[in-house]
Amino acid sequence: WKFLALLGYAAIYTYLAPWHLPSNRWYTWVIAILGVDLLFYVYHRTAHRVRLIWATHQAHHSSQYFNFATALRQKWNNSGEILVWIPLPLLGIPPWMVFLSFSINLVYQFWIHTEHIGKLWRPIEFVFNTPSHHRVHHGMDQEYLDRNYGGIRPLRARLFGPPRAPTPRPDTGTIRTAEP
């Protein structure tokens, strides 16, 4: 499916994008990475609210342990996720950069699935999604549900819904199955 998506993105980029941003410029990378991160937030929030998408995402949240193995619990299909990034080639981001930016986003999110890192220095906690933010996202306690959907940056959580600090540490897992 990724190859087909790459072909689709290439067609959108080639025939529909009003301009093409240069891949050798730093600002294109910033736009690509932040764009993927914003659209990841949109998709991730949707995945928690739309029953069909939650059915593919719930395995990631079902572990009662918050560790690197939890990070590897990924869906086998894209459940429409690939459609979320269509605006990026339309904005002139080269398709290969969209995929690489998504890979960077996913690799970043791997390390935040751990209990071994506590709260970090306050400026880091403010700018980046950290294990303490993501612990809240995986929490099954009522006060932690539906929080902190960000990938790399928690800014979207600050803008679109209040972030929560884990006090005390939340129990992880899921309280629901196919119901979002």
Regions found by a protein language model. Give the residues of each.
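Charged, amphipathic alpha-helical linkers/stalks
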Residues: 179-180
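Membrane-embedded catalytic scaffold of the fatty acid hydroxylase/desaturase
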Residues: 1-2, 22-176
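Juxtamembrane/interfacial segments at transmembrane-helix boundaries in multi-pass membrane proteins
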Residues: 6-30
